[in-house]
């Protein structure tokens, strides 16, 4: 069996959970002896065997970003000839999978749903008119796909809600995973101090991109209520738009007028530095208003951190309230934005959960150890590779 994986992100160019998923899934599948996996990704040429990078087309340099994406996708299609299955990840690569399958090669197209355009209307802020194009690409590809892999039960429900014409039997759940050998507690006090954090003082830490869905503005407001000795550490980069970047910067400046120990690392750090920063923290916080699963929570749990996270999307399938962390309740406006119905209440509940986490170190450590056990036992990439292979075989009738 030959499977061609189509993705915007692939090492070394990874900036989100979808990229982590693709990299780890490819590694798990290539470890098997009964299949060949070829990767087609955006960007520069890769040295990795059976992996092809596809740069932006210079002829489309002045075009809308979504049109540029379509150009790269079309460049990918030619390389899929001879594949038994094409498997695309995110709308950025869905067009390539759809063209290869439905219009050219005839092989089955499988899509992994990491996020959905109808559930992220704020992307119009980033893509402009291209949001209508990305939404059309996603809808067209999903409705024609042989199977859709949802990364959580919550995502499966969202797929069927967003695209009700899809046969529910075609939508399978295969969770994201974690490499618990790589993601583990590894003290690095020099690294931590080098970023301006005192490893001997309590801290709450956020890791993620600066996007609407990650809920950073709510977190920055909630952190006003933390005890003064608690540091606030934000490993937050890759802003979607100048607008969200400016909003976060303004809230950060305001928070710094009320307390010391607010540390913002605006670039995406190497994994070894992230694990050192996680190891030094007291609790991890994920204030997302939209999160299909949240690999970042698994990464924190694997590093033995208790997690304070919003009870939305697939997060409750990872974080067990009262066992591995605290789930913060949220009632959301049903317009696709994930906006809290009562933002002040959400901020207050988030602050209360964070205060619980930092006020009882023994309980926090207990939750962290339980989180590590859960990550190891339930979310290994080997098992996720096996379950993905089952989906491949089902569409091939093997």
Regions flagged by a language model, labelled:
Residues 201, 245-268, 272:
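Nucleotide-activated donor-binding/catalytic signature segment of Leloir-type glycosyltransferases, i.e.
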Residues 88-93, 113:
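Short His-centered aromatic/hydrophobic patch
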Residues 20, 202, 206-225, 246:
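A conserved mid-protein helix/loop that constitutes part of the nucleotide-sugar donor-binding site
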Residues 289:
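Aromatic "clamp/platform" in nucleotide-sugar-dependent glycosyltransferases that forms part
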Residues 306-309, 319, 326-327:
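Short hydrophobic beta-strand element within catalytic cores of glycosyltransferases
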Residues 154, 177:
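Carbohydrate-associated surface elements
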Residues 45, 178, 231-249, 263:
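Glycosyltransferase donor-sugar binding loop
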Residues 107-108, 118-140, 157:
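Nucleotide-sugar donor phosphate/pyrophosphate-binding loop at the beta->alpha transition
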């Amino acid at each position: 069996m030959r499977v061609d994986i189509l993705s915007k992100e692939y090492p070394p160019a990874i900036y989100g959970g979808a990229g982590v998923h693709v990299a780890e899934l490819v590694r798990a599948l290539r470890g098997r002896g009964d299949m060949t996996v070829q990767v087609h990704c955006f960007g520069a040429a890769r040295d990795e065997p059976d992996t092809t990078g596809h740069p932006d087309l210079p002829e489309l340099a002045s075009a809308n970003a979504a049109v540029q994406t379509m150009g790269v996708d079309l460049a990918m299609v030619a390389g899929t000839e001879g594949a038994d299955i094409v498997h695309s990840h995110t709308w950025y690569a869905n067009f390539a999978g759809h063209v290869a399958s439905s219009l050219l090669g005839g092989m089955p197209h499988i899509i992994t749903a990491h996020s959905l355009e109808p559930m992220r209307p704020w992307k119009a802020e980033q893509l402009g008119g291209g949001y209508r194009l990305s939404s059309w690409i996603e809808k067209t590809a999903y409705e024609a796909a042989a199977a859709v892999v949802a990364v959580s039960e919550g995502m499966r429900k969202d797929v069927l809600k967003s695209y009700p014409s899809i046969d529910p039997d075609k939508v399978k759940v295969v969770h994201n995973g974690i490499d618990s050998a790589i993601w583990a507690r590894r003290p690095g006090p020099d690294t931590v101090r080098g970023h301006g954090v005192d490893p001997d003082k309590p801290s709450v830490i956020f890791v993620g991109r600066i996007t609407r869905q990650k809920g950073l503005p709510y977190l920055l407001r909630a952190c006003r209520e933390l005890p003064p000795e608690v540091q606030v550490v934000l490993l937050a980069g890759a802003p979607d738009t100048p607008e969200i970047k400016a909003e976060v910067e303004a809230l950060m400046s305001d928070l710094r007028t009320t307390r010391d120990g607010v540390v913002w690392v605006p670039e995406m750090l190497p994994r070894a530095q992230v694990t050192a920063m996680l190891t030094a923290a007291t609790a991890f916080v994920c204030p997302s208003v939209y999160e299909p699963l949240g690999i970042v929570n698994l990464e924190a749990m694997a590093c033995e951190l208790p997690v304070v996270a919003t009870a939305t999307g697939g997060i409750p399938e990872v974080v067990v309230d009262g066992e591995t962390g605290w789930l913060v309740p949220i009632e959301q406006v049903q317009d696709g934005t994930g906006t809290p119905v009562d933002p002040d209440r959400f901020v207050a509940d988030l602050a209360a959960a964070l205060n619980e986490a930092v006020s009882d170190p023994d309980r926090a450590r207990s939750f962290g150890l339980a989180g590590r056990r859960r990550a190891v036992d339930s979310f290994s990439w080997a098992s996720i590779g096996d379950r993905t292979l089952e989906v491949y075989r089902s569409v091939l009738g093997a």
